[in-house]
From Swiss-Prot:
<comment type="similarity">
    <text>Belongs to the HIV-1 REV protein family.</text>
</comment>
<feature type="region of interest" description="Disordered">
    <location>
        <begin position="25"/>
        <end position="50"/>
    </location>
</feature>
<feature type="region of interest" description="Homomultimerization">
    <location>
        <begin position="18"/>
        <end position="26"/>
    </location>
</feature>
<feature type="short sequence motif" description="Nuclear localization signal and RNA-binding (RRE)">
    <location>
        <begin position="34"/>
        <end position="50"/>
    </location>
</feature>
<feature type="region of interest" description="Disordered">
    <location>
        <begin position="86"/>
        <end position="123"/>
    </location>
</feature>
<protein>
    <recommendedName>
        <fullName>Protein Rev</fullName>
    </recommendedName>
</protein>
<dbReference type="GO" id="GO:0016032">
    <property type="term" value="P:viral process"/>
</dbReference>
<comment type="subunit">
    <text>Homomultimer; when bound to the RRE. Multimeric assembly is essential for activity and may involve XPO1. Binds to human KPNB1, XPO1, TNPO1, RANBP5 and IPO7. Interacts with the viral Integrase. Interacts with human KHDRBS1. Interacts with human NAP1; this interaction decreases Rev multimerization and stimulates its activity. Interacts with human DEAD-box helicases DDX3 and DDX24; these interactions may serve for viral RNA export to the cytoplasm and packaging, respectively.</text>
</comment>
<keyword id="KW-0597">Phosphoprotein</keyword>
<dbReference type="InterPro" id="IPR000625">
    <property type="entry name" value="REV_protein"/>
</dbReference>
<keyword id="KW-1048">Host nucleus</keyword>
<dbReference type="GO" id="GO:0003723">
    <property type="term" value="F:RNA binding"/>
</dbReference>
<feature type="short sequence motif" description="Nuclear export signal and binding to XPO1">
    <location>
        <begin position="73"/>
        <end position="84"/>
    </location>
</feature>
<feature type="compositionally biased region" description="Polar residues">
    <location>
        <begin position="88"/>
        <end position="101"/>
    </location>
</feature>
<comment type="function">
    <text>Escorts unspliced or incompletely spliced viral pre-mRNAs (late transcripts) out of the nucleus of infected cells. These pre-mRNAs carry a recognition sequence called Rev responsive element (RRE) located in the env gene, that is not present in fully spliced viral mRNAs (early transcripts). This function is essential since most viral proteins are translated from unspliced or partially spliced pre-mRNAs which cannot exit the nucleus by the pathway used by fully processed cellular mRNAs. Rev itself is translated from a fully spliced mRNA that readily exits the nucleus.</text>
</comment>
<keyword id="KW-0488">Methylation</keyword>
<keyword id="KW-1035">Host cytoplasm</keyword>
Amino acid sequence: MARRSGNPDEDLLKAVRIIKLLYQSSPCPNPRGSRQARKNRRRRWRARQRQIDSLSERILSDCLGRPAEPVPLQLPPIERLRLDCSESCGTSGTQQPQGTETGVGGPQISVESSAVLGSGTKN
């Protein structure tokens, strides 16, 4: 896979064909034989599947030029997150004036959360 044809779709299709061929070359083990023989065949088959998985991952990362796993999204600490509901509470379904945004606010710390929650007793 070191040579590139120049067409990324063609390269990807070629990689998928190679991976498909690898998986087809290792069918499920035969369910006949003694219990120990079946166990050994399954163990060897699982080891081959792990090798095929790692090869497939390497082929795809080479073809795509990036790792198969996405880079984890860096989020701010949960203490700094809050919903911005200062003016739009209770106005569900109405349009906001130009220039105002609602939804998830910036990383602001809500101070009035204990007053809103109260002590937990009903009136």
